[in-house]
Amino acid sequence: MAVQLFFTEEQRKVFKSSFKSIDADGDGKITPEELKAAFKSIEIELTQEKIDEMMSMVDKDGSRPVDFSEILMKKAEQMRGKGAQYFKAFDALDTDKSGSLSPEELRTALSACTDPPMTKEEIDAIIKKADGNNDGEIRRAEFVRMIQSSY
């Protein structure tokens, strides 16, 4: 399925685990009753109207109940919306418009929003963690993955 390529293997595992925890009868589909029970198990009481509204947001084909692919598609839709915001943030930080964030660009940005300013070692650790191709800079895709993995 193409939408699965949008997510990392780790993300898919988390989504699948969450899905299975709601799918009480294990049939691969989530019914309104299962969704309501899942919320009730964490002491959140929702009206049937709210449950129906939530189901409709995910159930694009109106088939009720919803399956895992519909959940993935909704999550991808949400992440694509956030992706545009991440791209704007990246572009604002990429002051030399090189298509990557240098340690200096990251240091400037982080020192403006942290007090006390982050140390060189702390910034180097961030770059090392985010730098998938080990070129010492953070490319746009690496930046988006870094932001997404922190949530």
UniProtKB/Swiss-Prot annotation:
Ca(2+) 2 binds at D59, D61, S63, E70. Ca(2+) 3 binds at D94, D96, S98, S100, E105. The keyword Calcium applies. Keywords: Calcium, Metal-binding, Repeat. SMART domains: EFh. One of its GO terms (molecular function) is calcium ion binding. Ca(2+) 4 binds at D131, D135, E137, E142. PROSITE patterns: EF_HAND_1, EF_HAND_2. Residues 10-45, 46-78, 81-116, 118-151 form the EF-hand domain. Pfam families: EF-hand_7. Ca(2+) 1 binds at D23, D25, D27, K29, E34. The keyword Calcium applies. Found in cell lineages giving rise to the aboral ectoderm, a squamous epithelium covering the surface of the late stage embryo and larva. Calcium-binding protein involved in larval development and metamorphosis. Likely to function as calcium buffers mediating the transport of calcium from the sea water to the blastocoel where calcium is required for skeleton formation. This is Calcium-binding protein SPEC 2C.
